[in-house]
Design a protein with these regions (language model features):
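Amphipathic alpha-helical linker/stalk segments
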Residues: 71-107
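Amphipathic alpha-helical segments used for helix-helix packing
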Residues: 89-98, 112-135, 186
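Short, small-residue-biased leader/transition segments that mark boundaries at the very start
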Residues: 1-8
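C-terminal peripheral helix-coil segments that are non-catalytic and often amphipathic
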Residues: 116, 120, 150-157, 170-217
Length: 217
């Protein structure tokens, strides 16, 4: 029992050391990816900057892609959660046959959440947008457009039915899905601070919503 008691603080210290090592590797990797992009980034350089061996890196991460995804993955999960929560509200409205008018305030509330999340993790966003070529995150924006397109097609069909309007051409819906994503991409790549970004995004949403209503009513 004495040996077991002594082992506990040793294990705790090792966990703390491992946690600090992993955190430092991630910090150095983020700097390397931001400077060189995924394809040109070197695991050897990352380890040298971190003062660790490649063995230490492979203890925590399977490969370079796993390391890249570790840096941006949590943010992408939170972003997706915000979007899916918004989708659920819109699906409920559609399922009720739009017995009441669509609540535009939900669109602006979602926009505010997205802008805040994006600017809390702007480096990670820019990594995905501009530094991810060659990684499994390379086409994540295309996948987001596809996800949005599927949802928008469902909502558009429901709105057209409720308003007795002929269904909008799917290519137009697809273009509108691109426009929604492109608005946020333009925002994060051209605007440096959250306050200005939110003002831009709110105007952008007014424009997108007006265009949406113009073809479904």
């Amino acid at each position: 029992t004495g040996v077991q008691t002594c082992a506990l603080p040793i294990l705790a210290a090792r966990k703390i050391h491992d946690s600090e090592t992993k955190k430092h590797l991630i910090e150095c990797a983020k700097a390397e990816f931001m400077e060189k992009g995924f394809a040109r980034a070197s695991l050897r350089n990352i380890c040298q900057e971190a003062g660790d061996t490649t063995g230490a890196l492979y203890f925590f991460f399977h490969d370079k892609d796993d390391l890249f995804c570790e840096i941006v993955g949590d943010f992408m999960d939170r972003l997706n959660a915000i979007i899916k929560e918004h989708y659920s509200h819109e699906v409920k409205e559609a399922d009720r046959g739009y017995e009441n008018e669509h609540d535009d305030s939900l669109d602006f509330e979602c926009t505010k959440k997205l802008v805040h999340e994006i600017y809390q993790h702007r480096d990670e966003v820019l990594m995905v947008l501009t530094k991810s070529q060659g990684s499994t995150m390379e086409n994540v924006m295309d996948r987001l457009v596809d996800q949005m397109d599927e949802h928008n097609a469902f909502i558009c069909k429901a709105m057209c039915k409720a308003n007795d309007v002929h269904m909008v051409d799917k290519k137009v819906v697809h273009w509108m899905s691109h426009s929604q994503v492109d608005m946020f991409i333009f925002m994060v790549t051209h605007i440096d601070n959250e306050k200005e970004a939110l003002a831009f995004a709110e105007k952008g949403m007014e424009y997108l919503i007006a265009g949406w209503y113009a073809i479904v009513k």
